From Swiss-Prot:
Residues 12-21 have a biased composition (Basic and acidic residues). Residues 22-32 have a biased composition (Polar residues). The gene is rpl23-A. The keyword Ribosomal protein applies. Part of the 50S ribosomal subunit. This is Large ribosomal subunit protein uL23cz/uL23cy. It is found in: Plastid, Chloroplast. The lineage of its organism: Eukaryota, Viridiplantae, Streptophyta, Embryophyta, Tracheophyta.
Amino acid sequence: MGGVENPVSTDKAIRLPERKQYSSNAEPNPSKTEVKRRIERFPRVRIVAINSHRLPAGAARGSAGSVTGRRVRRKRMITTLRLNHPIPLFPGKQNGFVS
């Protein structure tokens, strides 16, 4: 999707589609406005709100198990959609949209 990397499948994220919300990891640099424009390029997708937070960076471990640095911090976006405007996650099911 350009800016949005992959959907998240945590316990909370699995329950979000019931409330027309979707959680995904995103590149750390784009703003909420840029991500909104990229997602709304899909036909019939309109966004009501975007919430984001930055995940903590983890320790990068070397070959001997010692900490050698930090991994890159990532951003997580929770997108709320308008009613009857789903994101096409699974092509081929219900006209390519998840309801």
